[in-house]
Amino acid sequence: MKPHLKQWRQGMLCGVFAWGLFFVVIFLYFTDSSPAKPAPSSFSFLETRRLLPAQGRQRAIMGASEGLPEGADLRRGSPRGLPSGPLRTWAGDGFEREQEFLSVQTGRTSLSSFAPEDSAPGTSGRLFPGDPGPEGARPPRAAPGRRAKRGPRRQSLSARGEDGERLYSSMSRALLRRLWKGDASARMLHPRLQKAMGAYLRANKHGVRFRGRRASGRSRTELLCALRGRVQVRTLDGTEPPFSALGWRALVPPVPLSRLLPRRLRTCAVVTSAGAILNSSLGEEIDSHDAVLRFNSAPTRGYEKDVGNKTTVRIINSQILTNPSYHFMDSALYKDVILVAWDPAPYSANLNLWYKKPDYNLFTPYVQHRQRNPNQPFYILHPKFIWQLWDIIQENTKEKIQPNPPSSGFIGILLMMNLCGEVHVYEYVPSVRQTDLCHYHEPYHDAACTLGAYHPLLYEKLLVQRLNVGTHGDLHRKGKVVLPGLQAVRCPPGA
C-alpha cells in the first residue's frame, strides 16, 4: 500500500508542477506579446494639436530647411541694373511713373483669384468641453466589471460638457463686447489659451528683452502721433551684412516699398482671412478702395461676394515660400501683385544669426523668385520693423504680451497706415458674425486664430480698436475698423 501511496504523491506533485509551469509560460507569453504602451501626455498631444493653429496653422508645416541657405550668393547671375520690360519705367523713374504700375495692380481682375493646390486642411482638436476630440485622444475603456458604475458618471460628464459649452459661449460673447469697447483682458480667455500664453511667455524663443516704458493710458491722438514718429516701413535693402556680401543690393527692388505706391491713394482695404467674413457681402465695398491688401494664400475666386476680387499687396509669411503645397513659384495667386514677405527673427534683429537660422528659409526662394521675376516688386520686411511693432504693442498694454512677433494682420495694418490716407480693416476685430473658423477658405476651427496664443492677437486688436475712428455700427455689422493714415495725422510740435 505504501509504495502505491508514494507513487500517487509523486504523480500529484509532478502534475501540480506541470500546471504551474504551464501557467507561467502562458503568463509570460501574453505579457511579452502585448506590452503596455505608455499613455501619451495630455498636453503633448492634445495641447500641441490644439495650439498649432495659434501660429496660423502653418507653423506646423515641416520640411522647410532652417540651416544656412544655399544658392543665395548673388554675385554671380544676379540681375544687374534696372529691370527691362513693362515695369522699366516704374523702376527707373521711381515716384514719377508709379501710376503705370498701379493701374496694373489696383484696377486689375486678380489673376490670383483662385487658390493653389493646397495641402489638406488640418483637423482641429477638442476646443470646448463636450466636443469630440481627435482620434487617439479617447479615454481607455473601462473594465467589464465596472461598466455598471460608469453610467451615471458618464451622464454627469456629458451634462458638465454641455454646461461648459454654454459657459464658454457666454464668455465668448462677453469677450467680444469687451473687445468692441477696447478693454478686454487675457483673463477672459478660455483656460486653454491662457495656458498657451503662459507657456510662450516662459519659453521666450526669440530672446525678447523689453526695456521700454509702458504708457497704456495714451489717448488716440497721442498714440497715433507716437506711431507716426516711430513706425517707418523698413525692408532689406542689401546694404547690411551678410546680404551686402552676397550681392543683394542688385537683387532687391530699386524703389523702396514706402515710395512704391503713389500718394494719391485715398483709401485702402486690409482684408483679413477670418472666417467671420463669410456671408458678409462686403466684396463690392472692398473693391471700391484704391488699393487692397490680402494675406498669405487667401483666394478670391468663389468668394468675390464677400471678399472682393482686387489685390494690390499680398503679405506672405516665410512658410508660403518654403512649403511646396503653396506652389509659390508658379501659382497665379502670387503674380501681378506687390509681395511682402517676413520671417520671425531674434529680438536683437541680428541679421547674421537670422540668415544662418531663419524660422523658415525664405532667402533661397526669394533669390530664385527675384531672378525669375525681376520686374515684380518683392520685398522682405526688416526684423527691426517687425520687433518695433511688438515694442509698441507692449508699451501700450498693461499685461505682459507673448514674446513672439505680431501677426501678419497687424503688420499689414501698420504697413498700409504708412502708405494710405485712410485704412479700412475688415474682420480683424470680429463682427457679430464671430466664429472659430480660422480662415474663410479652410474648414479649420480654433479660437486661437481669433484671440491668439502664439501671436499677441488679443492685444493687437485692443490697440487697433483704440485707434478706430469708424462707427460702432460698422464695427458690429461689418467688422470694419477705420484708421487714419499716419501721414494724415496732425501732431503738436515735439510729439
Swiss-Prot record:
Composition-biased stretches (Basic residues): 144-153
GO CC terms of this entry: Golgi apparatus; Golgi cisterna membrane
Family, as annotated: Belongs to the glycosyltransferase 29 family.
Residues that span the membrane, as ranges: 11-31
Keyword annotations of the record: Disulfide bond, Glycoprotein, Glycosyltransferase, Golgi apparatus, Membrane, Signal-anchor, Transferase, Transmembrane, Transmembrane helix
Bilayer topology: Single-pass type II membrane protein
Catalytic activity: a beta-D-galactoside + CMP-N-acetyl-beta-neuraminate = an N-acetyl-alpha-neuraminyl-(2->6)-beta-D-galactosyl derivative + CMP + H(+)
Topological region Cytoplasmic: 1-10
The UniProt record lists the keyword rRNA processing: no
Gene encoding the protein: ST6GAL2
Positions in the Lumenal compartment: 32-495
Protein name: Beta-galactoside alpha-2,6-sialyltransferase 2
UniProt feature, compositional bias: Low complexity: 134-143
GO process terms (BP): carbohydrate metabolic process; protein glycosylation; sialylation
